[in-house]
Amino acid sequence: MGLTKKDIGLRIGAFGAEPWTESMRKEIEERLGLKGYNIYGLSEIMGPGVSYECQEQHGSHINEDHFYPEIINPETLERLPNGEVGELVFTTLTKEGMPLLRYRTKDLTSLMEGECPCG
């Protein structure tokens, strides 16, 4: 195409829909000259925008005014404490037409409590 990073002029990219590795992130950032951020969503809930990375990139912020997240043991279905890896489960708080109650995502992750350095 003959375009350079300067020609494109992108500074930020938000990427979702599929998991990516840190090496993939680094390659995209280097090739396009931008800072890449992860955005998480589920089409069953609302698509992108369930959670997103901030500039600190210490994990994703969940939009807790719309979603109640839990982590469960996928075999026993017992709720796990913060910091332990398990299956992510969501309850929607603001969907009126088709609310989801403890929707199992099949995604493995953990929840962190506390304040992010971004504020």
Q: What is each residue range found by the language model?
A:
Residues 1-119:
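Active-site glycine/GP-rich loop and adjacent strand/helix microenvironment
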